[in-house]
């Protein structure tokens, strides 16, 4: 079965076999007329077809178990697939095994999956009395609607689908949740069931292993266990409290970044947390982003709490006159921003209402875009390398609705392409995915569990300089408008630390670990030596703790191991008398001895190994 053709690919579109036969693109065995074959395997294109059909298998099984069920949409998403539906029956996660069993029954029946095309009038009649299907059709233009059938079940769908349910053997329903109809909280709440599907048993097994591993690495769980951060209902949802260990971790990253930014010619700046609404009207945020902002009134004047740092940096630029000799100007700020997120989407540190961006804005001429972006790409590589992240880039180009001259857009986009080419970076292109005011590069990192995360962005902006009438004097003594480059490499410290925690499973590398060394005196007479060693390490900028509670030695060692501290030193008579230290090194997975002076030199050099 692994070599069977299940679909073809042409012009960036997956076409299922039934449709491909009609179009002369396949004879059912091989791809024809320049199309790319899609075989039954765990490749991305094949999985899209497999998971789409598994969503229909889920709906078919739900209809069999709950006859009054009505279905909205069942798309393929990054984490598998889901189906939104409603029924008068109460369904909980405890029902998922029963639903899954019914899915396996239908799969074993080897039902042919066929397609029929109806006019709008025919489709409305076919699904008469089904308000959810009518809601789907109301969002679709044209007069052709696909309906896929398998056994007695049929559903409105554009495809693509497998030719038969016999292909669906390796799937798992993963969770149940609520979802508003069409994502609008003013509409009724539907039930959403998520699932995953693969072509092979190995694919499913590996995925389920990753899910279990992800649960162990969940940053919300690690945040509590390692004492990094917390949330408090009395303070409010989405507003994290950084505990001492988490703040130490964060400060280390901030300090490393600041050192690198200063060396790279960035100037630190700081804008206010609240700004008059007048400037948000000039920037366009008031008209286009108001629902995500918080407002207050002071002396009968409306102010907006900043959701972004760009306006403050523009005002820094406007605080002085500039000539072409001043450019590029690079301003950076660890800017605290607030955005109104719905409570349902808040998720640990990954999605919060207050967060701090590693934000920078570069004001430069058009001719400097490529060199500035190239420098940002170099900086990005060094940061990702330090944290052992692989990453990819995606270039988003001009959308249909945009401002600016075609030649200006082309010039800006080519500058980004040339910068990527200069660094030999393979990148994807998201045609039309740019902002209305300029092209951008998105930085997507891959963690240890092979999950992709959107973090940083490099955004060329030709809009805000125009709105705020920014200018510099060029070499011909004429006023010229600068280009503004928004850039954040980590995205936000909150989000990045959440990803970092899960990437390392809490086993942070030595250079950023919130506690780098644990000192464990065996008894009271060794305590003075431990404190002396602690001071020597602190002078070398090492985060160190003395575990001196009245517990057994084994218990103190276990505590240090649970806290995932990179180095543990047990201090007894021998260590105090000889000053030869016994070291448990997590990174080396080894225990060894080292003279005190040599150890101090070693940890000092370890702190110098990493720079951005």
UniProtKB/Swiss-Prot annotation:
Zn(2+) binds at residues 310, 361, 486. Binds 1 zinc ion per subunit. It is found in: Cytoplasm. The keyword Protein biosynthesis applies. GO terms for cellular component: cytosol. Its cofactor is Zn(2+). It catalyses: tRNA(Thr) + L-threonine + ATP = L-threonyl-tRNA(Thr) + AMP + diphosphate + H(+). GO terms for molecular function: ATP binding; metal ion binding; threonine-tRNA ligase activity; tRNA binding. GO terms for biological process: threonyl-tRNA aminoacylation. Keywords: Aminoacyl-tRNA synthetase, ATP-binding, Cytoplasm, Ligase, Metal-binding, Nucleotide-binding, Protein biosynthesis, RNA-binding, tRNA-binding, Zinc. InterPro entries: aa-tRNA-synt_IIb, aa-tRNA-synth_II, aa-tRNA-synth_II/BPL/LPL, Anticodon-bd, Anticodon-bd_dom_sf, Thr-tRNA-ligase_IIa, Thr/Ala-tRNA-synth_IIc_edit, ThrRS_anticodon. Coiled coil: none annotated. It is an enzyme of class 6 (ligase). Gene3D superfamilies: 3.30.54.20, Anticodon-binding domain, Bira Bifunctional Protein, Domain 2, Threonyl-trna Synthetase, Chain A, domain 2. Its main location: cytoplasm. Its EC number is 6.1.1.3. The keyword Protease does not apply. Residues 218-509 are annotated as: Catalytic. PROSITE patterns: AA_TRNA_LIGASE_II. Homodimer. Catalyzes the attachment of threonine to tRNA(Thr) in a two-step reaction: L-threonine is first activated by ATP to form Thr-AMP and then transferred to the acceptor end of tRNA(Thr). Also edits incorrectly charged L-seryl-tRNA(Thr). HAMAP family: Thr_tRNA_synth (MF_00184). Belongs to the class-II aminoacyl-tRNA synthetase family. This is Threonine--tRNA ligase. It comes from Helicobacter pylori (strain ATCC 700392 / 26695).
């Amino acid at each position: 079965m692994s070599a069977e053709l299940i679909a073809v690919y042409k012009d960036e579109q997956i076409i299922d076999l039934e449709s491909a036969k009609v179009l002369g693109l396949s004879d059912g065995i091989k791809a024809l007329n320049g199309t790319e074959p899609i075989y039954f395997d765990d490749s991305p294109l094949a999985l899209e077809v497999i998971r789409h059909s598994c969503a229909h298998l889920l709906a078919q099984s739900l209809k069999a178990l709950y006859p009054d069920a009505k279905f909205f949409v069942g798309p393929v998403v990054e984490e598998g697939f889901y189906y939104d539906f409603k029924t008068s029956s109460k369904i909980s996660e405890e029902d998922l095994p029963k639903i899954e069993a019914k899915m396996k029954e239908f799969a074993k029946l080897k039902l042919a999956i066929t397609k029929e095309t109806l006019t709008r009038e025919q489709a409305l009649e076919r699904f008469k009395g089904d308000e959810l299907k009518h809601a789907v059709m109301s969002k679709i233009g044209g007069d052709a609607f696909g309906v896929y059938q398998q056994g007695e079940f049929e559903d409105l769908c554009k495809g693509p689908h497998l030719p038969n349910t016999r292909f669906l053997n390796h799937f798992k329903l993963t969770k149940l949740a609520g979802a508003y109809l069409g994502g609008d909280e003013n509409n009724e709440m539907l039930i959403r069931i998520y699932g995953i599907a693969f072509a092979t048993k190995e694919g499913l097994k590996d995925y389920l292993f990753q899910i279990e591993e992800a649960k162990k690495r969940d940053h919300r769980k690690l945040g509590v266990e390692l004492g990094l951060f917390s949330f408090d209902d009395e303070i409010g949802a989405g507003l994290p409290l950084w505990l001492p260990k988490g703040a130490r971790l964060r400060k280390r990253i901030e300090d490393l970044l600041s050192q690198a930014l200063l060396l790279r010619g960035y100037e630190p700046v700081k804008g206010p947390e609240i700004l008059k609404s007048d400037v948000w009207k000039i920037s366009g945020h008031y008209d286009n982003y108001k629902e995500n902002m918080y407002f207050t009134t002071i002396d009968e004047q409306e102010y907006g709490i900043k959701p972004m740092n760009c306006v403050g940096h523009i005002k820094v630029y406007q605080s002085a006159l500039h000539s072409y000799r001043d450019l590029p100007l690079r301003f950076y700020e660890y800017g605290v921003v607030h955005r109104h997120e719905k409570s349902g989407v808040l998720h640990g540190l990954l999605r919060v209402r207050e967060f701090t961006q590693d934000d920078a804005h570069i004001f430069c001429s058009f001719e400097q875009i490529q060199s500035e972006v190239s420098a940002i790409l170099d900086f990005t590589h060094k940061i990702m390398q330090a944290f052992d992240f692989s990453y990819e880039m995606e270039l988003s180009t001009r959308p249909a609705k945009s401002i600016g001259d075609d030649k200006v857009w082309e010039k800006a986009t080519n500058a980004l392409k040339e910068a990527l080419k200069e660094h030999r970076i393979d990148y994807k292109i998201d045609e039309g995915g740019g902002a209305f005011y300029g092209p951008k590069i998105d930085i997507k990192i891959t963690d240890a569990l092979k999950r992709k995360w959107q973090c940083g962005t490099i955004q060329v902006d030709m809009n805000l300089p125009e709105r705020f009438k920014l200018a510099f004097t060029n070499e011909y003594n004429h006023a010229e408008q600068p280009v503004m480059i928004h850039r954040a490499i980590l995205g936000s410290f909150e989000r990045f630390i959440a990803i970092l925690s899960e990437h390392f499973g809490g086993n942070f590398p030595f250079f950023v670990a919130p506690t780098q060394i644990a000192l464990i005196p065996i008894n009271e007479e060794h305590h003075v030596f431990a404190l002396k060693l602690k001071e020597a390490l602190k002078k070398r900028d090492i985060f160190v703790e003395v575990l001196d509670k009245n517990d057994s030695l084994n218990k103190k060692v276990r505590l240090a191991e649970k806290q995932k501290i990179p180095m543990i030193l047990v201090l007894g008579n021998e260590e105090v008398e000889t000053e030869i230290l016994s070291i448990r090194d997590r990174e080396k997975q080894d225990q060894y001895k080292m003279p005190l002076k040599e150890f101090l030199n070693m940890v000092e050099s370890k702190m110098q190994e990493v720079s951005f």
